[in-house]
């Protein structure tokens, strides 16, 4: 009888330990998720030059300039890591406004949207970029991109019109939402070709 009671007590203790472990694990996951995405109040402090474009959980980015890559506009193919490890994207040309009040994105064409102003991502944070749903419903696709910690410069993101029809888009339109995420253990700052817009100053990358 005593052995049966001891076994029951031991099983109860093991159940309690298991429940405590699960509870602790749940709390840790909740704590990790809580506050990882920066909300609108903090965003206005972190990005004062975008405070008028702060949404609920992100920043709405506007197009400043639009560029196109296609066979007609590009004078060479793209090269990455083939010749002396040089990175040479296809040249691309600015989409001219030509007196219109909006851009026209032609079917099955790939574009670069240059954001209308520079952005600085604070150290210890990254950004993820998403196409606003209105444009997704028009058949546009935003290429995957992450803004690295301590990046400073003007973003240029790829957009593809996958639809069989033209998409008309107003100048300076809010098209992309940037979600800012706090990271743990980040001690490396971005120092690539796009830092401080240095690559945009090379004529070959603007099709000039």
Where are these regions (language model features)?
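DUTPase catalytic domain/fold
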Residues: 4-208
């Amino acid at each position: 009888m005593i052995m049966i009671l001891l076994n029951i007590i031991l099983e109860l203790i093991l159940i309690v330990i298991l429940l405590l472990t699960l509870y602790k694990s749940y709390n840790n996951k909740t704590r990790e998720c809580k506050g990882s995405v920066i909300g609108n109040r903090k965003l206005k402090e972190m990005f004062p030059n975008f405070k008028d474009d702060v949404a609920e959980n992100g920043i709405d980015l506007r197009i400043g300039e639009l560029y196109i890559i296609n066979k007609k506009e590009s004078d060479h193919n793209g090269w990455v890591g083939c010749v002396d490890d040089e990175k040479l994207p296809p040249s691309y040309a600015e989409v001219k406004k030509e007196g219109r009040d909006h851009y026209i994105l032609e079917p099955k064409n790939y574009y670069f949207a240059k954001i209308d102003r520079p952005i600085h991502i604070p150290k210890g944070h990254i950004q993820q970029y998403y196409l606003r749903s209105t444009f997704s419903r028009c058949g546009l696709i935003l290429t995957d991109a992450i803004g690295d910690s301590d990046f400073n410069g003007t973003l240029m993101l790829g957009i593809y019109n996958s639809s069989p029809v033209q998409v008309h888009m107003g100048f300076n339109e809010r098209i992309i939402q940037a979600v800012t995420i706090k990271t743990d253990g980040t001690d490396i700052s971005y120092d690539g070709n796009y830092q401080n817009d240095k690559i945009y100053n090379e004529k070959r990358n603007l099709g000039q």
